């Protein structure tokens, strides 16, 4: 597949932005937006250790200009075996998109869903085919001028996923986007935009992967989730990148009245991950469930910042993030619950738990509250623990090998996450990858 992939553009510049936009035949409004993002990129500094949000994550070795941007293109092809394994059985999906090195090789959507108004395609294609549905929403949830990474993404994103669900349509099966990346020195910048109209329901699963010893690469992604009144979105982001990859991203949802978003973030791969996951509950009665799981080994570094923003009365958020760390892996969790003055009757819960398997591993956890309302319930907490040797001894006394005993304890630790995932394909993939991560643990 690599031979047929579009060439990666190099040397970040305003001319590159104009060239990529022109080659894609984009409308003037999008070209102008990209150029404005480029100006912000030039103006904004790269985050440093002086920034509190970046103090525990060292990116001093990162050179954004060293990665060539992968443009989006479409070319029919067969999925590489690792991507097929990552996606699993497509029969259980209502729709499927497969992307290799920026090239969309497959797009599948049942005719009955298309006839009922569901749109599931790349965002680049949607700009041309459905501008009336893209333009009002693109960039309204994630702004290009928030920091240098957002600006980098806003100027140069390509491909990504556009999912539009018309009013009242409920889709029972998940839609799946599978992405494989193995291009040396590539920058992959997908943008996902999900718009669910009133009283609709949909599930989007995005899986990403590259070979364990794969090429050096950069991923900078953004996800905008927009559920209208009474709509429900379930979003899963599962990555198994190779260790030579940097990943930066943001997943942000803005919820209207009585809307619901369930998000699940899973990180198994990459050398360094820095991701923001945020829910802004702006409509009365809206609900956000935020789940996260990270399993680090070697020298992997995972940094998650979460925000539960309650801006309306009678809203509910529930966050549970868990990390398992071995070898010299490190995790950073910074979570904020914010309840504005008008957010009375708020219910907000935030919990981060970490399990350390090796002496050299480390977890930093910083849960926070900002409360302006006075009639609400907010709880937050964090814990970091190590394996209980007494419990391991007890299991081994029942003729279980130590490796099996430890795996049972890890499974028990993660069961709180697994039990809240209704998607069998996701639970199965998580279980398989956790088992692989534990193979060399003694």
Which functions belong to the PLM regions below?
Residues 27, 40-43, 91-92, 349-350, ...:
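Generic hydrophobic-segment detector
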């Amino acid at each position: 597949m690599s031979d047929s992939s579009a060439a990666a553009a190099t040397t970040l510049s305003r001319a590159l932005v104009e060239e990529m936009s022109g080659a894609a035949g984009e409308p003037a409004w999008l070209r102008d937006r990209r150029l404005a993002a480029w100006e912000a990129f030039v103006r904004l500094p790269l985050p440093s250790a002086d920034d509190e949000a970046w103090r525990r994550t060292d990116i001093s070795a990162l050179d954004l200009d060293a990665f060539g941007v992968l443009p989006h293109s479409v070319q029919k092809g067969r999925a590489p075996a690792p991507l097929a394994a990552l996606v699993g059985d497509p029969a259980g999906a209502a729709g499927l998109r497969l992307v290799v090195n920026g090239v969309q090789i497959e797009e599948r959507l049942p005719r009955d869903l298309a006839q009922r108004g569901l749109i599931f395609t790349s965002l680049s294609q949607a700009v041309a085919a459905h501008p009336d549905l893209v333009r009002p929403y693109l960039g309204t949830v994630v702004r290009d001028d928030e920091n240098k990474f957002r600006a980098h993404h806003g100027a140069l994103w390509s491909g990504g996923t556009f999912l539009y669900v018309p009013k009242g349509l409920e889709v029972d099966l998940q839609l799946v986007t599978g992405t494989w990346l193995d291009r040396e020195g590539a920058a992959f910048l997908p943008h996902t935009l999900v718009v669910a109209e009133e009283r609709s329901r949909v599930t989007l699963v995005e899986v990403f992967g590259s070979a364990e010893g794969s090429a050096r690469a950069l991923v900078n992604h953004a996800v905008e989730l927009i559920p209208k009144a009474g709509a429900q979105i379930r979003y899963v982001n599962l990555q198994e990148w190779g260790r030579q990859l940097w990943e930066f991203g943001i997943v942000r949802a803005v919820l209207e009245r009585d809307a619901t978003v369930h998000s699940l973030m899973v990180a198994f791969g990459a050398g360094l991950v820095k991701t923001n996951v945020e829910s802004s509950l702006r409509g009365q009665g809206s609900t956000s469930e935020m789940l996260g799981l990270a399993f680090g080994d070697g020298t992997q570094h995972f940094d998650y910042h979460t925000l539960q923003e309650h801006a309306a009365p009678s809203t509910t958020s529930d966050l549970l993030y868990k990390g398992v760390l071995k070898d010299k892996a490190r995790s950073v969790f910074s979570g904020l619950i914010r309840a504005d003055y008008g957010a009375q009757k708020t219910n907000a819960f935030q919990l981060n738990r970490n399990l350390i398997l090796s002496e050299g591993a480390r977890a930093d956890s910083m849960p926070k509250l900002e409360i302006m309302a006075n009639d609400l319930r907010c709880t937050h907490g964090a814990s970091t623990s190590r394996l209980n040797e007494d419990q391991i001894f007890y299991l081994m006394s029942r003729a279980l090998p130590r490796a099996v005993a430890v795996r049972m304890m890890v499974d028990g630790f993660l069961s709180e996450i697994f039990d809240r995932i209704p998607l069998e394909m996701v639970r199965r993939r998580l279980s398989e990858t956790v088992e692989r991560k534990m193979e060399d643990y003694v």
